[in-house]
Amino acid sequence: MKAISPVRSMSSCYQAVCCLSEQSLSIARGSSLKGAGIDETMGLLYDMNGCYSKLKELVPGIPQGSKLSQVEILQHVIDYIFDLQIVLGEDQQQNSILNLQKSDFSELATQGDARVCH
């Protein structure tokens, strides 16, 4: 017989109490641990499907209303992240070039001012 953790890590006390009461009811009814494991597995599967649906909504470039496999959704997500990294890299590169140009210009300006004054 496997041990069941009486309290799962949950954000609120209310959810922990509900979890305990559900476990107590399943023990009192005499349900097997396998049934609880299957229910938990199905719950995780539905959660993952929900996550894939949310990714389809959030990531641009994924055609809405089309049936895509989970692998295809993940590939779109990876491509989108890669595109974001490229854009952020270009922005950082442009900012560093602008900062370099500003520093060169300010150095030239101070040298030019010195020449004018002398």
UniProtKB/Swiss-Prot annotation:
Please describe what this protein does.
Transcriptional regulator (lacking a basic DNA binding domain) which negatively regulates the basic helix-loop-helix (bHLH) transcription factors by forming heterodimers and inhibiting their DNA binding and transcriptional activity. Influences cell fate decisions in the embryo by sequestering and blocking the activity of the bHLH transcription factors that control these decisions. Inhibits the binding of myogenic bHLH-containing complexes to E-box DNA, thereby preventing activation of muscle-specific target genes. Also inhibits the activity of neurogenic factor neurod1/neuroD.
Assembly and partners are described as: Homodimer. Heterodimer with other HLH proteins. Interacts (via HLH domain) with the bHLH protein hes4/hairy2 (via Orange domain). Interacts with stat3.
Select a single GO molecular function from the record's annotations and give it: bHLH transcription factor binding
What is the designated name of this protein? DNA-binding protein inhibitor ID-3-B
Major site of localization recorded for this protein: nucleus
> Can you name a GO cellular component term?
nucleus
Q: Where in the cell is the protein located?
A: Nucleus
Question: Where does the bHLH domain start and stop, copy by copy?
Answer: 32-84
Q: Species name for this entry? A: Xenopus laevis (African clawed frog)
Give the InterPro entries listed for this entry: bHLH_dom, DNA-bd_prot-inh, HLH_DNA-bd_sf
Q: Does the keyword Translocase apply?
A: no
Biological process (GO) annotations held by this record are: circadian regulation of gene expression; negative regulation of DNA binding; negative regulation of DNA-templated transcription; negative regulation of transcription by RNA polymerase II; neural crest formation; neuron differentiation; regulation of cell cycle
Keywords, sorted A to Z: Biological rhythms, Developmental protein, Nucleus, Repressor, Transcription, Transcription regulation
* Keyword Nucleotidyltransferase set for record: no
